[in-house]
From Swiss-Prot:
Name of the protein: Na(+)/H(+) antiporter NhaC
Cited PANTHER family: MALATE-2H(+)/NA(+)-LACTATE ANTIPORTER, NA(+)_H(+) ANTIPORTER NHAC
Membrane in keyword set: yes
The species this protein was found in: Alkalihalophilus pseudofirmus (strain ATCC BAA-2126 / JCM 17055 / OF4)
Annotated membrane topology: Multi-pass membrane protein
Highest taxon of the lineage: Bacteria
Function: Na(+)/H(+) antiporter. Involved in pH homeostasis and sodium extrusion.
Pfam families: Na_H_antiporter
One GO biological process term: sodium ion transport
């Protein structure tokens, strides 16, 4: 008969795991993959101690992986999109015009706002980061902007749409699991989103004016290199435009990315004159490669391909497998139940919900679980304490959706790091919007700002 995991047992396991991960990443300076494998083995040993059968543990690993099949496939496709859009001249064209228009001091805030607009229209941070985000990173590199700052601006802007857009899957998922109307949920999000985003804009404005940048001569040399090696045409922008339009029309992400790849290949053939099928396959697999004569431009355009995403895909697979085992042996349930004790006030309830979402993100690396599990666990307590459930759905978004990109082994974190070429640990200090939002939701919960009672919500619906 299986044993039930106690709070002490749960804290011991999590403590051991976090010690391994933190020591490995910050002291030994190694990649997170093997430390997570070690944690997986330790979790399995703990599971056997609790008398969970090995077959059950294997099934839990498979169940954990099932959650990540779609994100993994998207990771692979985005790697291909990047390579194809380099080959087609799409990113070089955006880079050329971006260097001509955007001044260095306005780069950070411009990137933030551009990515915010695109993600709001598409509802997808992955699509935004993998398309316009890559182009903005290239512009930032050419302008001499710190890559960590550029990545922070891209991630903040991209995650705005993930949180606020009615087209976003998490924006629909969070209110859906707790029975809150979608647009009530979005309106309620404004209480924490507006101040967090305004502060983020101000911080990026301040940072932008203090950045050392490339000289005019350097920029002109890059423009010359781009113009000499690529056919820079508005036709190369049709592919990303089509991707954005299809995403706005709520087409599924995977078919949208496939369309982006196919139209990019067609553009490469007719605009760039690259009709070599064998070279297409090589670029799709290994990434775009060209010597432009400018070292900075070479570093920007020589990237992408399926192979470039294998680091992230393998990390996500290990993390999701670990998350499946952790969930199966009862660690997450025990952790959540321990947080539901002594919930006597609205502030404590919202703080406990946020802490749970962050904890599930850290333990499993999975965004949806960080919304689903705390949502179902705490839902009845919001009714019991007469706190409007739109506070619950808002907290799940602020601490679930937005924290995942801050976890190096999280699905979003691994994807953003691989796509932008900047480690999560490096861009984290500049991901202002992502950590300001959960802070605001906890603070407002205690201060009573932007919250309502369940009874008033019920009357409104009636």
């Amino acid at each position: 008969m299986e044993k039930k995991a106690t709070v002490g047992f749960t804290l011991l396991l999590l403590g051991v795991m976090m010690a391994i991960i933190i020591t490995s990443m910050f002291v030994l300076k190694v990649e997170p993959h093997i430390p997570l494998v070690v944690c997986l083995l330790i979790a399995a040993v703990f599971g056997r101690y609790l008398r969970v059968g090995w077959n059950d543990l294997e099934s839990a690993m498979i169940d954990g992986l099932k959650i990540g099949i779609k994100p993994i496939f998207i990771l692979a496709l985005v790697g291909i999109v990047i390579a194809v859009w380099m080959m087609s001249g799409t990113v070089p064209t955006l880079l050329f015009y971006g260097l001509s228009i955007i001044s260095p001091e306005w780069f950070a805030v411009s990137t933030l706002l551009i990515c915010m607009i695109v993600s709001s229209f598409t509802g997808s941070s992955f699509t935004t980061v993998g398309t316009i985000g890559v182009a903005m990173m290239g512009i930032g590199t050419a302008l001499g902007i710190d890559p960590a700052i550029a990545a922070g601006a891209v991630v903040c802007g991209a995650c705005f749409g993930d949180k606020m857009s009615p087209l976003s899957d998490t924006t629909n998922f969070a209110p859906g699991i707790v029975g809150v109307d979608l647009f009530d949920h979005i309106r309620h999000l404004l209480w924490t989103t507006v101040p967090s985003f305004v502060i983020t804009v101000i911080l990026f404005l301040m940072i932008g004016r203090s950045q050392a940048t490339s000289t005019t001569q350097d920029i002109q040399a890059m423009l010359t290199a781009l113009d000499s090696q690529f056919t820079l045409s508005v036709l190369t922008l049709l592919s990303p435009l089509l991707v954005v339009i299809l995403a706005m029309r709520r087409f599924p992400t995977i078919p949208v990315l496939v369309v982006g790849i196919l139209t990019g290949i067609i553009t490469a053939a007719f605009v760039q004159g690259n009709a070599d099928v064998a070279r297409w396959f090589t670029i799709i697999q290994n990434g775009f490669s060209m010597e432009t004569g400018n070292e900075v431009i070479d570093g920007i355009v020589n990237r992408g391909g399926l192979q470039s995403m294998m680091w992230s895909i393998s990390l996500v697979m290990i993390a999701l497998t670990l998350g499946g085992v952790i969930q199966r042996i009862g660690v997450i349930d025990t952790l959540l139940q321990s947080l539901t004790r002594k919930l006597s006030s609205r502030g404590h309830l919202i703080a406990a919900t946020a802490t749970s979402s962050i904890g599930v993100n850290v333990v499993t690396g999975e965004q949806y679980l960080s919304i689903l599990l705390p949502g179902k666990t705490f839902e009845s307590f919001y009714t019991k304490l007469n706190v409007a459930k739109k506070n619950l759905s808002r907290t799940l978004e602020d601490a679930g959706t937005l924290v995942n990109p801050l976890i190096p082994w999280g699905v979003s974190g691994a994807f953003f790091a691989s796509t932008l070429g900047v480690d999560v640990i490096d861009y984290l200090p500049f991901a202002f919007f992502l950590f300001l939002s959960p802070f605001m939701t906890i603070l407002f919960g205690y201060l009573g700002i932007g919250v309502g009672k369940e009874q008033s919500l019920a009357n409104k619906r009636g």
